[in-house]
C-alpha cells in the first residue's frame, strides 16, 4: 500500500515524523482526510484540531493540535502547529477544566486535548 510521509512540528519541538496510510484533521473549511497521492493544498487548522494518523499494522496516533497549518503534496503531509501533544501526554481532567475556560484560546486547546483522548467527538 502507498504511504504518506508525515511530519508534525510544533513551535517548541518536532512531534512526530514517519509513514502513514491516512491522516485526518479539521481545517477552517471543514474536515479533511488525506490519502497518498492527494492533490496539493495548504489549509489553516482550526484552533481545537485533533490529528489522527493511521499507520500500517500499528495503532493510530491521536495528537491534539492548537492552531497551525497543513501542507499537502502528492507524497508528504506537513503540519506546523503552535503547540501539539500526543494523547498519551494529556491529563484528561486538566483538559476538561481548560475546555470550560472563559478564555476562547484556552477552551479551544482543552477541546483539542479532549478529542485526542477520545473524550469528545
Swiss-Prot record:
InterPro entries: ATP_synth_F1_dsu/esu, ATP_synth_F1_dsu/esu_N, ATPsynth_dsu/esu_N. Keywords: ATP synthesis, Cell membrane, CF(1), Hydrogen ion transport, Ion transport, Membrane, Transport. It is a peripheral membrane protein. It is found in: Cell membrane. One of its GO terms (molecular function) is ATP binding. One of its GO terms (cellular component) is plasma membrane. SUPFAM superfamilies: Epsilon subunit of F1F0-ATP synthase N-terminal domain. Its main location: membrane. It comes from the Bacteria. Transmembrane segments: none annotated. NCBIfam families: ATP_synt_epsi, PRK13442.1. Belongs to the ATPase epsilon chain family. Produces ATP from ADP in the presence of a proton gradient across the membrane. F-type ATPases have 2 components, CF(1) - the catalytic core - and CF(0) - the membrane proton channel. CF(1) has five subunits: alpha(3), beta(3), gamma(1), delta(1), epsilon(1). CF(0) has three main subunits: a, b and c. This is ATP synthase epsilon chain.
